[in-house]
Amino acid sequence: MADTKVAMIVGGGSGMGAAAARKLAADGFAVAVLSSSGKGEALGKELGGIGFTGSNQSNEDLKRFVDLTMEKWGRVDALVNGAGHGPRAPLLEITDEQWHTGFDTYFMNVARATRLVAPIMVAQKKGAIVNISTAWVDEPTALFPTSAVARAGLAAYTKLFANQYAADNVRMNNVLPGWIDSLPALDERRDSVPMQRYGTSEEIAATIAFLASDGAAYITGQNLRVDGGLMRSV
């Protein structure tokens, strides 16, 4: 058990987060899965690990989740931060409350969990944090305004974190999915992708697993697009 690697997946009840939990478990990680729906609790138990029902917008829930993980395994090697869906509206119609909700959903989900888990990784002198972001960080779209703005902030946070903790062998990277099959399938969206298809949650999970692995030991502070060539910027 001392040699077992441990992964915590926050927001792992469905979609890309659940696929990441399954992939990491298949790669030999013991997994702890949190979601607000109860699906993460069921999945964690199905995979032989910990399942926890709680919110990534609650410091108390996150602390209990971390405490349960440490009580069982005594370490955390990987943290995967997923997110739900924030408000969408025409730009000038987004209220203060909606902006705050967007930042809670797409930025503070990472900041809260990282505050709790990073010190554990620093003490271990090893750890990897992978955040599920969006391909529209560099090319914002009015379709997802609060996501684009908050996750641009997440990109800056990731650089700051990477610079500060790289010497402790603790890494942070962002995965930037484009159109993924956990979203509604629309022909015009599919046709806008050079690969002419939606990506799969499993493809995102494979990228997350790579970034959490020793094969990515020299990668930190990066935003890795997994979008089928959708974004045109260099």
Kindly give the residue locations of the regions a language model identified.
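Conserved glycine-rich cofactor-binding loop
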Residues: G13-S14
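Substrate-binding pocket helix/loop in short-chain dehydrogenase/reductase
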Residues: F65, P90-L91, T95-F103, I129, ...
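Active-site loop-to-helix junction immediately N-terminal to the catalytic Tyr of the SDR YXXXK motif
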Residues: I94, P140-A148, L160, R189
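Active-site helix of classical SDR
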Residues: T114, A150-R151, T158
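Alpha-helical segment proximal to the catalytic Tyr-Lys
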Residues: P119, N163-Q164, A217
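Short C-terminal tail/terminal secondary-structure segment
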Residues: E139, A209, T220-V234
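Short, small/polar-rich loop/turn modules that mediate ligand/substrate recognition or access, typified
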Residues: A166, R171, I219-G221
